[in-house]
From Swiss-Prot:
Leaves (at protein level). The keyword DNA-binding does not apply. Gene3D superfamilies: Endochitinase-like. Chitin-binding protein which functions in defense against chitin-containing fungal pathogens. Inhibits the growth of budding hyphae in A.alternata and A.brassiciola. GO terms for molecular function: chitin binding. It holds the Pfam family Chitin_bind_1. Thermostable. Loses 5% of activity at 100 degrees Celsius after 1 hour incubation. It comes from Moringa oleifera. Residues 64-79 form a propeptide. Residues 21-63 form the Chitin-binding type-1 domain. This is Morintide mO1. InterPro entries: Chitin-bd_1 (IPR001002), Chitin-binding_1_CS (IPR018371), Endochitinase-like_sf (IPR036861).
Length: 79
């Protein structure tokens, strides 16, 4: 029973942490904390998967293009 309680608590914390990381269009155009990049899927991170404009970065992006995307700028809506 103790293992089940621990597992339940662990999963609850994991879900709360993952939910707290949402950004961009998926989260009301919210920007990431600590100047992290917002990926095309609405998650914060610092690697090229999150920060590259070619990968669909939404804010605090690095490399390529015009504006730097700082301040929670969201990407375009497409055609």
């Amino acid at each position: 029973m103790a293992k089940l309680s621990f597992l339940s608590l662990f999963l609850l914390c994991l879900v709360a942490t993952a939910t707290a990381q949402n950004c961009g269009r998926q989260a009301g155009n919210r920007a990431c904390a600590n100047q992290l990049c917002c990926s095309q899927y609405g998650f914060c991170g610092s690697t090229s998967e999150y920060c590259s404009r070619a990968n669909g970065c939404q804010s605090n992006c690095r490399g390529g293009g015009g504006a730097d995307g700082a301040g929670g700028e969201a990407g375009g809506g497409g055609p």
